A protein has these predicted regions:
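Secreted, disulfide-rich extracellular signaling modules
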Residues: 2-435
Length: 435
């Protein structure tokens, strides 16, 4: 049975005359086996905020694209990356000519309508990528355009029972051969010092910016950790052209790499003009009936655990604490919910994982069932609650829920807030009174 704050306060106020030792429950071992004793629900307030200052430097996936979400509006992603030489001081032979150039982008995932046409553009970066920290709001100046095309990607990594692979594992973009003739092949003889080391090359060539068109309805994720993440230059020279034997080469190959280790970052914007909720009008006094989670810094849920303040000197021992976060039924049919969430404690501008993570997993995995994907996230936060009820008077009663892989995944979810009339988000405590 759900109990509101008043009931919780009355239940604990009975023992408020007993002096607290200041070490409430700290010697207990966390675990659901300790969910015994009296159960009570703690009052809280929930609302939604944007996540400021999301670091997107060297993310697990680089993103391009956008889509119109009827609830969250339109998120848009692009990325900038350095390129490095596959070998220094390349020798392209006599009279080399670039035949073609392709940028290979290994798929890591996608979100949205994969049957829709997708516009994508590749440009040389006019901004050097330094050792600075890059955020979602960081930008890079785009220079000369190397590719601007629209097509329907055939992304897929499924393998049928027959062993036949469906779809392509990478996106291939044809870049301007004339530009790479000038910048790489001709430079190998006209200005060889820029190719003598990767340090010299990075001073010479800032990198690439990859972005999407304004009407895309998909966001694609690409894996910089894949060995096939590269720009591949196909070329011929006098020797290759003169060899007409069947065993002879048709072309030479040289690669510029954008694999893990180079500087790269995601650039993110959110247009919430068509969103179904307003971040500027959140009820932070009473809380909201629906709250929101969105990757790429789009939305996070803030919890104020007001009910715990009244319990600090109760003298009761909290054996187990569970946070239950229901997902709005039917909200994740078209757009997938995150596989997991994390819980942060918020102290001023500082955001850190709660102490329960020091002992391993606290849960937070999404479990759903039924046609409408009904489910919830569940967290064991016993140690954090014990800390808040202990002597640490500097503890903050604010927590934050964030999606996993927030810098590289757009997954989102609609959650039940504390003001939901049927199944609100809840913090349940199991407690006992020491003799």
């Amino acid at each position: 049975m759900r109990r509101i704050l008043a009931a919780a306060v009355l239940a604990f106020a009975f023992a408020s005359c007993e002096k607290s030792t200041g070490e409430i429950g700290l010697d207990f071992v966390d675990g659901s086996q300790f969910a015994f004793g009296t159960k009570s629900e703690v009052a809280m307030r929930t609302h939604t905020e944007a996540f400021d200052s999301l670091v997107t430097l060297r993310p697990a996936a680089l993103l391009v694209g956008s889509y119109q979400d009827p609830i969250f509006g339109r998120p848009t992603a692009s990325f900038a990356t350095q390129l490095v030489l596959s070998s220094v001081a390349p020798d392209f032979g006599a009279n080399p000519t670039v035949d073609s150039v392709f940028m290979i982008l290994p798929y890591a995932g996608w979100y949205g309508d994969t049957t829709a046409a997708f516009q994508i553009k590749v440009q040389r970066s006019d901004s050097a990528l330094t050792d600075s920290v890059y955020y979602a709001f960081s930008t890079a100046a785009a220079g000369e355009t190397l590719c601007d095309t629209s097509f329907v990607p055939k992304a897929g990594v499924k393998t049928l029972r027959t062993g036949t692979r469906v779809g392509e594992t990478s996106m291939f973009l044809k870049l301007s051969r004339q530009k790479f003739q000038e910048w790489i092949v001709d430079a190998s003889t006209a200005n060889p010092s820029v190719l003598e080391s990767n340090a010299a090359f990075l001073d010479y060539f800032n990198g690439l910016i990859v972005s999407g068109g304004p009407n895309n309805e998909t966001m694609y994720q690409f894996n910089p950790g894949d060995a096939s993440a590269k720009v591949r230059i196909f070329y011929t020279n006098d020797s290759i052209r003169a060899d007409t034997s069947t065993a002879g080469l048709d072309y030479g190959v040289y690669d510029l790499l954008w694999t893990s280790g180079v500087q790269s970052f995601n650039m993110i914007t959110h247009d919430r003009s068509q969103a179904s909720f307003d971040l500027a009008a959140q009820d932070t006094v009473l809380g909201e009936s629906s709250v929101y989670i969105q990757g790429l810094g789009g939305a996070v849920t803030v919890l104020n655990l007001d009910g715990l303040r009244a319990l600090r000197d109760s003298g009761y021992v909290v054996n187990y604490a569970e946070l239950v976060v229901p997902v709005r039924e039917g909200s994740n049919l078209k757009y997938q919910a995150p596989g997991g969430l994390s819980v942060l404690q918020v102290k001023g501008s500082a955001k850190t994982l709660i102490r329960d993570y020091q002992r391993g997993s606290v849960g937070g995995t999404f479990s759903a069932s039924g046609v409408l994907r009904k489910g919830a996230y569940r967290f064991e936060i016993t140690r954090h609650v014990q800390d808040l009820l202990g002597l640490d008077t500097t503890s903050s009663y604010r927590m934050m829920l964030i999606p996993e892989r927030m810098a590289s995944s757009p997954l989102r979810a609609v959650l039940h807030g504390n003001a939901d009339a049927v199944e609100p988000m809840s913090l349940n405590l199991w407690y006992t009174k020491p003799n």
